[in-house]
Amino acid sequence: MPFARFEKLEPEKRERLLDAAAREFAAYGYAGASINRILEAARFSKGAAYYYVADKADLFAATVAWCGEQITLLDGALDLTALTAGTYWPTFTRLRREPLLRSQQRPWLFGALKAVEQLDPTTLRDGPLAGYVARFQAYVLGMLRRGQALGVVRADLPEELLLAWLQALDRSGDDWLLAHWDALTPDDIARLADHTSAAMRRAVAPDDHERA
């Protein structure tokens, strides 16, 4: 992650750098992104930028964390213990829908987050993003296990398989939305996001709940 002094950078300059980086990573992915283009768009010199971040990987980690905060990808106020069998799936659906709607005017925020998927497992585990990835995985796993405890997510299959199913549907839905973003209204985004959530529910619901 960036050096501690990055947080002392003037908020307007910090946001300008992170927004430029988000646009670049969303457009070109991590591998194709150019730190020179980012710095030019943000009106930063290399000397100034490297005073705050060590390299492109460091800047990417900071950008991902910032994008996640901007769209509230992880809901810090979520109380898993308060969820019931009746509120679990509506809450799940809302938690998927709302970050997408918050991205509606700035789709590059979501696009930059999607660029994380291009990194190999070793980089995700050991690189600057390791802490953020661990928090995200714990968030998702906590949600899955709460659903199992409530009896609304099946518990007869390995967690890894259930997560793989959910991830595949989530990625497919998000990729389609991003590819068609400019033609979609907020209502379209919400409706399609909810359809994907419904498919995710059907994929992991216990057999006796599949038609619920």
Q: Residue ranges of each PLM-predicted region?
A:
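Hydrophobic alpha-helical connector segments
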Residues: A62, G76-R106, E159-L166, A190-A193
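Short coil/turn segments at alpha/beta junctions that flank glycine-rich nucleotide-binding fingerprints
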Residues: A27-A31, R106, L150
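Short secondary-structure transition hinges
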Residues: R94-L141, E160-L163
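Short, basic, alpha-helical segments at the C-terminal edge of helix-turn-helix-like DNA-binding modules
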Residues: A65-I71
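Hydrophobic/aromatic-rich alpha-helical bundle segments in the mid-to-C-terminal region
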Residues: F110-A115, D126, A130, Q148-T196, ...
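N-terminal intrinsically disordered/low-complexity leader segments
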Residues: M1-E12, D208-A212
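Helix-turn-helix
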Residues: R16, E24-D58, A62
